[in-house]
Structure formats: structure tokens, C-alpha cells
Amino acid sequence: MTKGFASSGLVVVILAGNLAVIAAADETHIHRNGFAGREPFWIRGDANIRFEEKRHKISDEHARNAPTSELVAIEAHPPGGATEAEFVHYYYPIPPAPVSPRLHAGVWVKAYRAGVELRARLVLPKERDPQNPEAPLTTLLIGDKYRNVRYWEPLSLGNVPELLRRHLPVLHARLGRAVDPSDAYIDQIILNVYAGPGLTEVWIDDLEVGPVLPGSVPRPSASVATPVKNGSGSDDRPPPATKSVRFVEGQIQIDGEKFFMLGIRHSDTPLKTLRDANLNTVWFPADASPDTIEDAARQGFWIVPTLPVLEVPDNRGPRESTVSLAAATLAQQLRKYAATDAVLMWNLGGGKTAEDFPAVKRTVEVLNEVRFKQPRAIDIWDGFRSYGSYIDAIGTHRWPLFTSLELHRYKDWLSQRKSLTPANTMTWTWVQTHLPEWYINQVIGQPGAVKFDEPIGPHPEQIRVLTYLSLAAGNRGIGYWSDRFLANSHQGRDRLLELALLNTEIEMLKPLLLSANDPAKWLGTSHPNVHAAVIRSENELLVLPVWLGPGTQYTPASAAIANLRITVPLVPDAAIPWLVTPAGVTELKGWRRVAGGTEITLPEFDLAAAIVFTSDLKLDGKIVRWQDHTRYRVGELAAQWARQQAIEQYNKALLTHQKIIAAGGPELPETGSLLARARESIDRSREFFENRQWDMAYREARRAQRPIRVLMRADWEKAIQPLDFPSASPYAVSFYALPKHWEFAREVASSQPEESVLDYGQFELSREAPTEGAAISSLPGWSTRQSILRQDPVIAQAGIVNSQGLADAEPQPRIQLTGRYAPLHVMAPSPDQVDKPRPVLGSHCLKLEIRPRVACNPRGQPTGRPQALERSFLAVDSPRVELPPGTLVRISFWAKVPQPIEASADGVVVYDSVGGEPLSARIDQTRGWQIFHMYRRIPAAGDISLTFALTGIGTAYFDDVRIEPLRQAVNPRLSSSGDRGAPQLPAESSTRLRYPRTVPSSSGP
């Protein structure tokens, strides 16, 4: 058996650090704080020396996990002859934590001098305080002392019952009698921050105490209690100020500082886990509870509440009373957020179109009336100009993963949406982290599933590529769609780790992303599948090379390239290239000036990278700050996260590969060596980590995932070899669905097609079509539809046209020279010329065309062709075909797209009613006539139909469309191999299943 790595089965567990939510019985009674709020939580307590509080705030200078920690900085002035009894206490109130063997109390501390000590206040409720008989007796328990200077170190109380047992004789001696310790509990965690004369700075993070009794969670110190008077006099800190949120020139500004949104839609993942993943914004549904909202604000999140959109009265009569009621409901909804200053913007919904604009406009007007001035945001599909006049932030999104939309086309789509957005409007996009409903229903076959027992996608690598493309498109915010698919219930540990790593990188790159002057420019590189986005800011450049190879949306390739070369134009003088990762920042050596710019060589490219050209090399400059940041703050975590992710990826890939083999997939001879290479890199990563070499540990963990991707990609490529395109089989769109694909393929391969049951799929008319084409309705059951916004200057037309002149040119015979001019070597004809099937066209075929409408500017001059269309959709629908549920069918059609489709990332789309648009055949251009096949199973509804659609400027032709039922003709011979006990195809067909294919008939269609 191939060796695997053990992994925990907790709910959302990241063993690499405090990205953990423990699924224990008393999980709800563990009190945690990551100190990610806006005001300090620790309260200044008593002291026996004079000191001054220099700083006390939530700080982003150092943090063990989340972006912030709490900083306490004091300057102590002890008297002469001081002993070790001096103290300056800061305390943190907690719900009562009863003393028991299970009680644990600890906190992480970092300082530049040793001596900070953890303590706790113990309450003995059965005893009275002699100096205050109305209060219970309290005493201090002493825990660990900080020693590991400049590094984060956990301080713990240790065995609390043992501490109490040892302390009882002291209390007995002090009181002169025995003490009853029953029902004792801890109610305060205390830090003695005195570490000697002078300045002491202490950063505090990741407090955890439990089990505790259910109770209220402490508020920040400014609102919890008035600090105790001490040696420094009264507390004169001003009350916390309300933060100002403004959107200026497409940027979010908070108190005048630029802010990059890293958000997520919240469902049920603990907010602490999301904060530890370095997210800073949470999108809440309309029914979010006030307690959850308050908890998010306390965790330091910015909040984006979802508000209902008001109805608009129709033309049939006054409905002002209905609108007034809706406005009152909206006002009531807004009051839920009146007590917090953490609202970043109001969300007015998603997937809106131009037709929804009047209702959104009315809602904005009501928001103005009730004087809620926070910016407004909306996610739209089209109607950019209208929404841009009323909305401060516009989001766009689509789900490219597991569909036929290649990621280089998704890149184009992002750029087109950005170009349609009005200038000075903040933009963001949602990144797909989940499986869409269609995938869960069709591929997995578990509608409404709340848990998945086997590995599922998306791959972390896919999320990384989508995020980099979103950054390159110029978005000032990233939203991750689903927090639920980050949980262990959804096999999401590796995705959660990827989000944490990505957000750590983005936090480092944020100054360059927010100061970009112009949209990114895309460059080619030395590898055709790698494109590099160049983002320019003042005196600096950010270069983002990204792997965009075919099929990445299905299953990522290895995407590892040695010595990738990029020529970057217009690099500022004295700027040096640096490779930036969350575990280290290193200079790229060997760059040189060449014609066209500066050529850099990336020794080890892996899927995506961030390269910064800068001359800011001062001691307090950007590079030094980044190096300190990775060395002392995030590098250790990044290395841990990357190694844990590699282990998770290894185990998921191994399990799925074994299931593929059991389902009849081919053995891969290189499997053993690939898995061995992955294990070796994981082991080396652990060794580097133990030696505190964070950068090397991170790199090895990343290297470990490359052979895993090679294995997954090889399995996927074997599966799709017989297909015209991957989504022709609904189970070939993901590596994790391949076991089902091989079962499906066996059934298809053992079938024979019957006659087509689709009427008029040859598009033949009883008479010759007119020059402009005959109407689609000339064929019974066939229909056409279109949806074109008036903003799109195009004209769409579909019809049945004469096929004369549309046949492919016959290949010209080669002239064979003889004699002295005869070539020494004769080039064999290409497989396309020899094996390419050719259609036998009838008299007519289907034509779809969208062409630009002649338009003029105000000066009467013709405008150019549109570069992006908001919504231009021309479609022809076939008749509905009824078949018994469960019937396998083969769909085939011939298509000819003479020129690339312009102004649309989708091009020509052909899909069936079973697989839908995600599983469509997308065509941008063909070399002559080309045949396409799709294989589907009839659903319970018992019918299927086809749609031929054009989404951009261009022309497409179709002919010989068939829907052929497949009947079982041959039962594959079953044999067992080894000890697997799984049915296998005969050896000659085990590596490539022979799908039944359409063969053109010499007698014509």
C-alpha cells in the first residue's frame, strides 16, 4: 500500500498554528481572543512602582496569527534597591473558569526583554476577604515567565489544581486557619509587564482559557471598566473615536488611509478562524443575528450587511403604501447596525441586471433619507453605467472552475468588466472557493449536501490563480465566496490554508496594489502558458506571472518552470527585482538590460509569483521591513501552513488516485516515484522548519505539491483523451470526479448509437433560403431569442442560410519534384490533413451573426468597434426531445467559426438542457468545419434540448445536429487484476476507451 500522511479529523483544523477550531464537547466554553479589535482588551491594573504607559493599542507591528495583536508599552521607574517583587499588572477579565484538571489558561507573548510573567486571579467563593467581608477571598497564581527574547512564546499557568494545592499552605499561614478551596475559579488573567527599569514593549496574542462557564465576553477596555489607579496616576486616555469610511477615486479610505478589502461571505464558520486566515471583512446575510455582528466587530472585522431592495410601484396604480412599508422595514433593519462603527458599506444584493436598477435606485434614496451615509455596494452582471451613478462599489463575478471557460478567457472577462465600470468607482470580485450547485447535483449527485465524505474541489492552486487574476484586473478588493467549503465537513482544510497564505501575501503587496497608476499590462514570457501582469506605481513595479495553461480550470498542471524569463519594459532606474513570498524576500540575481526593457530570470516558477522592482533599500525601507516581517512575524506560520497543505494535498490525491484505479482507470507507471518525491520534499520541509529556516521550509513544501499535481494531471489527461473537449463528459471536469467518469466511460464505450431523435437537425428547407436567410421558425419546434442592452451597439440576426460556399477547401496535393530539385526528405502530411473528418453539407445550415451597429460620436464621426459588450446574447433553441429517464445520449454537431469572436470572453456557446451552460462547448474560432460530441444521461424529467448561442461580435455556422440514444451493445469482459477486485476493461482498451463517434455518411445528411 502506498504510504500516506496522517491528518486530524477536527472540524476546521489547521495544525500549523492557531487556525483551529477544536471539535470538543465543550467547544462553546473555551474563551479565546486573537486581539483583532479596534480598542485594547487588557485593563491597566495595580502596580507597586511608578511607571508611565507609553502606548497601549491594537497593533499591526507584530502578530502571531491574525494581522494584529495588543501592544502594551511602559517606561518603569523603580526605586533604588528594587527587588524581584516589583510588578505592573494588566488584567484581562474572563468568564469564571472553574479549577479542574482540564483547566488550561495561556497566552502568547513577544518582547525585546525577558521577564514578563503570566499570573491569574483565583477566587475562593467559600471564603471571605478579611479586609472586605462582602467580597470573596482572592489570591494570585503564578505561571510561566517570558524568556525567548524577540520571538513569540506561549505562557501558561500549567497544572492549575497543583498550583492551588501548593498555594493553600501560604493562605493557611496568612489567615491562621484552614481554607476551603471548593468551587474555586479564575476570573482574571494577569500579565506582569514589568521587566526592568526603562522601556518594555509587550505584544500579546492568542489568549485561550477553558473550560469557562457560559457568560459574556469582555469588551475592549475603553468600555469594560475604568482602570485601577496606580503609580502613574489616573487614566486619561480619550474615548475611542468613530472611524470614517470614504470611497475616494475608486479606493476605500478609512480615516484617510487606503484599505484593501479581503472579505468572505459568512455562514457558520467561527469568526476567529476567518480572522486567523487574515481576512478583514465579513459579508453578512440580512438575517444575521446581532450577537454575531457584535462578535465580528469585536474580532476587528469590517462588516458588509446585506439589505433588502425595495419594490418599485408599477404603472397599474399607486403602491406608495407598499413602498412606505418596505422603507420602514429597511429602516428597522438598519437599526441593527446603529450601535457599531464597523460597517464598511451596505450590500444591495448580487447578480443584479439593468432591469433591477429602478428598485436599487429607490433603495439608495431611502438610505439617504434615513441618513445612513456608509458607502453602497452591489454585485452586478450588466447595467454598469446606470449603477455607477448611484453606487460607490461595484462587484462582478462568475464561476469559471469546472466549466469550459478557460482561465485566459476568464482573465479577458475580468478586464472587460473592469473597462465597463465607470471611472473612480471602487471594484471588487468574488473568487470561487466552492462547488456550484449544478456540480453538486449533477457530478456528485448529492443535492443539498451539508457534508462530503470524499475529497472534492476546488484545488488550492485554482484559488491562487483566480486571486492573482483578480488582483491584476485592478480590483481594490477580493471576496472569497464560501466559508463553508473551507471546513472539514467540506474537505476544505487545504483551501483554508491557501486563503491564509494568499492573504498574507496580499497584505505585504498592498501598498503597491493600492498605489497603482494604471490598469495592469499583460506581457508574454519565455513559456507560452505563463503571462505576466505589470502593475505600475510611482517609482516601483509589481510583476505577477501567472500560469494560464489549458485545462487549469479542470485540473491544474504541474506549472513548474525552471528559469522563466520575463522582459519588463520601462523599469525605473536603480530599481532591483525582488521575489516576495510570505516566508521570505530574496533578490533575483542575473537580471540584465535588453532591447525592450529589463530581462529577469525566475529560477523556479511555480504557478504564480510576485516580483517587485524597487530601489527602497533603506534600513527602514520596504525591503528591510518585508524581510523583518517574514523573519519574525509571518514566516514561521507560512512555512507551517504550506507543509500542512502539502500533506493534505498528498492524502487527497492518493485516495482519489486509488479510487480511479479501482474504477477501471489506467495504472500510471510513474505513480510510485511521484509520491516518493512528494514525501521527500515534505520531510525536508520539516527539517528546515525545525532549524528555523522558514523560507527553505516554505519552498520545500511548495515543491512537494508539484509531483502531486503531475499525478493528478496525468490521471485527468488519460481520462479526457477520447473526448472532443473535457466537459463532453460531466464527470471529466474535475480530478476528484474521475472515478465516476471511468464508470460512465465504460457504459458509453459499450454502447452503440441509434438514429437521431432530434427533428430538423439538418436545417433543410423545402425550398432554397432567401439571401438574407430564412426564419428559424421555418423549422417546427426551433426558436430564437436574444437579449441585447441598448448600450451595446450591435445588431444580431439568426437564420437558416444556403450552405453554398461554406464547405472547406479541399487539401491541395503536394507537387513532387524530381531530378536534381527533388528534396532529400519528404515531410509527411499532418494528422489533421489525413484524419480530419469532413462534413457532407446539405443545402442549408444554421447561421448566427452579431455585427457592430454604425454609431457616431457627438461630432458625427464613426465610433470604433466595441471592446466589451455588457449583454449581447443571440440564441437558437432546438425542440425538446423526450426519452426515458436514465437513457444515455450522444449529442453531436458540426460548427464553423471563421474568425475569432470579439468583445466577449465566451464566444460561441453550445449547451444542452441537462449539463447547462457550465458544461457547454465554447468555441472562439475553428479551422474549417469541426465536429463536437457530448455525452449525457436523461434526467428524471425525461427530456433534453439544445441551445446554440453567440455572445460577441462574429459569425457562427452549424449543421448536422443530432441527439442519438445509446443502447448497450456489448457487455465489457470483466477481469480482476491483482488484489483490487474491481472490474477491468480488456487490456487493449483500458488506457483509452473507444467512444462511439459520428462518421459522415457518403449519402449526405
Residue ranges and their predicted role:
Residues I74-H104, R128-D144, F744-A745, H825-P829, ...:
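Secreted extracellular polysaccharide-interacting domains
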Residues K57-E86, D792, G799-D808, P813-Q816, ...:
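Short carbohydrate-recognition loop motifs
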Residues A24-K54, G215-S234, W716-S830, R967-P1005:
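Extracellular carbohydrate-recognition regions
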Residues Q131-D183, S913-D943, I953, Y957:
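Extracellular carbohydrate recognition and processing domains
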Residues V179-Y185, Y194-P211, V217-R219, A949-Q968:
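Extracellular carbohydrate recognition
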